[in-house]
Every structure is written in C-alpha cells, then in structure tokens.
C-alpha cells in the first residue's frame, strides 16, 4: 500500500515538477511524515524536515492555534528562500499548506486552489466553507453543491452528480477524487476518501507551473476573514443542548 501510494503521485507528476523548490516539512508525530517526504522528493523538491517527534503532538487544520501560527512564522524566518511549509495532522489525512511568509491557508480555500488546477465538471464541499469559494467557482463556471459536514455526504454528492470529473473536499483540507483525473504526465485514479497529499502537491505544483509564489497563488480568491477553533472543557450537557436546539430533520 505504501509503495502504491507513493507511485500514485510519481506517475501523475513530472519528476522535476518541484525542482529547485525548498520546502520545509513540519513532521511532528504525523504517521505519513516519511511517505510525504518521499513523494515531494520524488518530484524534485528539496525537503527540509523539522520538528520530528516520537511523542504525539495534537495539531488540527481546523484548530490552528496562535502558538501554531507563531511557529510557522518562525520557520519562515529561519529558512530564507523557502517555497512553502507543509504538514499534516496526526493521521495524515488533513493537510497544512503555509506560504513563504509563514501564513497558513485554510482547507476550504486550499480546496478551491486544487479545483482550479483540476478543472472538474462538478464540486461538492461542506456548507461550512466560506463564500469566497462559491464566488470563485461561479467565476469559473464550475457547478457545485454544499453538503452536510462529513466526507460521506461529499462522496454521495459526487456519486449522484453523474459528472465525468467529480471532486470534493472538506474544510479541513482533505480532498476527495470521485473520478479519474488526467494530468500532463499521467493520471490520478479515483480516491473517494480524505487525502492530504493531493492538495499539498497540487498547490505546490500549480504555483510552480505559474512561476508564482504560494501567497500570490491564493490571492486569486476574494479576501475573507474567518477563523475556527476548539473550546476546551466545554460541558457535555450544554453541548448536547446546543445540538438539540440546532438540529433540523
């Protein structure tokens, strides 16, 4: 399975797609840290691993803390000339894409960047995405639907669309391929499960193909100011009451 997953990207992208690009990879305790490193190196990138740990480090693309943000900024300062900082969450199905300035880009917007590169016939993504994504897809004449939160709803929407090139993603950045996608160097077979590597690779490759920076790549989206996080030690009784009050059949 490991070799097949690595080959998936090696066969779809050029071996020099990221040639000359210095990419800092925050490895922490992510289970896919070695696989992601190999994939990026196979595409020609110079990968600089940092922060490797054998102790679990909780990091979540939907709960990027002020400490996380400071760390990304520090990495950008410590590695002048870097192209990007990337990472995943602990089980490596949620991507982190941080530009050359140390700025983290949310998963809903990352999904739009990937979709711009794939040029699908249909997109499905969570209702919690910000409306800059809607605006951009409408400008590109890409049909889309909002789904309930969770990959099963996105998978169902892709299947029901009947589109030749159907894709989807979650606000955490995990990307799903509902159909085969041809690339300049090969193809990506359907993978209707949350994938962190595809959005990382496509964002980097797309910027490289356009000879631009990651920060400029994301500037195609209408500026929006959004944030998400977790409220710690919130009483279960109160959370259940909120869910019951907001539930709709």
Residue locations for each model-derived region?
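Buried hydrophobic positions in well-ordered alpha/beta secondary-structure cores of metabolic enzymes
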Residues: 23, 68-73, 86, 91, ...
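Phosphate-binding and adjacent anionic-ligand microenvironments
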Residues: 82-84, 120-249
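Solvent-exposed alpha-helices and their adjacent loops that cap or buttress functional pockets
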Residues: 13-18, 76-80, 88-89, 96-97, ...
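N-terminal small/polar loop signature for handling phosphorylated ligands or for N-terminal nucleophile
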Residues: 36-100
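Active-site glycine-rich loop that binds ribose-phosphate moieties when present
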Residues: 2-14, 68-71, 146-152
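Gly/Ser-rich phosphate-binding catalytic loop and adjacent alpha/beta segment
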Residues: 1-58
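Gly/Ser/Thr-rich active-site loops/lids in small-molecule metabolic enzymes
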Residues: 45, 49-51, 103-121, 186-202
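Short acidic, glycine/serine/threonine-rich loops at helix termini
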Residues: 34-39, 59-63, 95-101, 117, ...
């Amino acid at each position: 399975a490991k070799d097949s997953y690595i080959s998936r990207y090696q066969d779809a992208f050029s071996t020099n797609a990221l040639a000359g690009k210095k990419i800092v990879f925050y490895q922490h305790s992510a289970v896919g840290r070695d696989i992601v490193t190999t994939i990026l190196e196979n595409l020609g990138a110079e990968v600089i691993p940092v922060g490797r740990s054998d102790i679990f480090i909780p990091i979540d693309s939907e709960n990027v803390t002020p400490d996380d943000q400071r760390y990304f900024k520090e990495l950008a300062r410590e590695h002048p000339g870097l192209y990007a900082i990337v990472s995943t969450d602990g089980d490596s199905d949620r991507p982190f894409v941080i530009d050359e300035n140390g700025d983290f880009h949310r998963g809903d917007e990352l999904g739009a960047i990937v979709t711009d590169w794939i040029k699908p016939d249909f997109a499905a993504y969570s209702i919690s995405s910000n409306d800059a994504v809607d605006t951009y897809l409408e400008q590109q004449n890409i049909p889309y639907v909002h789904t309930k939160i969770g990959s099963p709803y996105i998978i169902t929407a892709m299947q029901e669309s009947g589109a030749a090139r159907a894709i989807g993603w979650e606000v955490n950045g995990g990307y799903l391929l509902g159909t085969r996608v041809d690339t300049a160097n090969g193809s990506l077979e359907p993978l209707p499960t949350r994938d962190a590597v595809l959005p990382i690779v496509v964002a980097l490759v797309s910027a490289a193909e356009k000879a631009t920076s990651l920060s400029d790549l994301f500037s195609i989206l209408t500026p929006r100011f959004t944030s998400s996080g977790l409220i710690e030690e919130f009483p279960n009784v109160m959370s259940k009451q909120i869910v019951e009050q907001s539930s709709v059949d």
